[in-house]
Amino acid sequence: MSSLLLFNDKSRALQADIVAVQSQVVYGSVGNSIAVPAIKQNGLNVFAVPTVLLSNTPHYDTFYGGAIPDEWFSGYLRALQERDALRQLRAVTTGYMGTASQIKILAEWLTALRKDHPDLLIMVDPVIGDIDSGIYVKPDLPEAYRQYLLPLAQGITPNIFELEILTGKNCRDLDSAIAAAKSLLSDTLKWVVITSASGNEENQEMQVAVVSADSVNVISHSRVKTDLKGTGDLFCAQLISGLLKGKALNDAVHRAGLRVLEVMRYTQQHESDELILPPLAEA
């Protein structure tokens, strides 16, 4: 093995702006399979850490793969530090997690990482389920989010259903959802972006609520009728990219929503069941 050791000059290590921890598929455009190209389109470098590796989403007639073993998962995280690839790290994002033990491992890694990066932005998309499907992750994941990841996050991006699960509060109207989001805020958790706040079905609108301790901003977007998967992952990728490029939170949320709409319409025009990224018009 020693004869294969070529790269031990850590001063030459490739550096990341973002570490993205979430699912990966061989076929399709969900999780890091859509987030990584979207982030790179924004001129940012990202390292992808998979939590599950799947052939495709379960919405096809065949489906293979599963959660990454804990030993591998912890090794992926540890290797980034062993390669000295995190000197310029600015943010860590999380999406679909395979197991509660992964969440605990990730939280321990983030806690240690923050000692060297006190300004690190940690953004958690607490993927648990949705109103139509209910909980579609393992039943011990919601408590793992509450116990391990929420205390570390500066921002989270739940949908209405996930907000209900995390808070134990009914969130089916906008005021109750905002109140529930505010109940999660802390000295660490500065903002909650509710990605499916109550919209106007008749006017074909959907709403995103940006909630912080001193403000609430509700952003409306056109509703696109589609079964496309991965739009939430794309939204989070665009949001973190906007924040790292210096956009204010409300502006970054607004621009992320517009980009998702653009991608969805572009995908529909190309008659694809999987998201297709058009060129990024704005630098």
UniProtKB/Swiss-Prot annotation:
Q: List the molecular function annotations (GO) for this entry.
A: ATP binding; hydroxymethylpyrimidine kinase activity; magnesium ion binding; pyridoxal kinase activity; zinc ion binding
- What is this enzyme's class at the first EC digit? transferase
Name the chemical reaction catalysed here: pyridoxal + ATP = pyridoxal 5'-phosphate + ADP + H(+); pyridoxine + ATP = pyridoxine 5'-phosphate + ADP + H(+); pyridoxamine + ATP = pyridoxamine 5'-phosphate + ADP + H(+)
Which EC number(s) does the record attach to this protein?
A: 2.7.1.35
Which residues does the annotation say bind Mg(2+)? Y136, E162
Family designation: Belongs to the pyridoxine kinase family. PdxK subfamily.
Instruction: Report the function annotation for this chain.
Output: B6-vitamer kinase involved in the salvage pathway of pyridoxal 5'-phosphate (PLP). Catalyzes the phosphorylation of pyridoxine (PN), pyridoxal (PL), and pyridoxamine (PM), forming their respective 5'-phosphorylated esters, i.e. PNP, PLP and PMP.
Q: Please state what the protein is called.
A: Pyridoxine/pyridoxal/pyridoxamine kinase
> Where does this protein come from, organism-wise?
Shigella dysenteriae serotype 1 (strain Sd197)
**Phylogenetic lineage:** Bacteria, Pseudomonadati, Pseudomonadota, Gammaproteobacteria, Enterobacterales
* Gene that this sequence comes from: pdxK
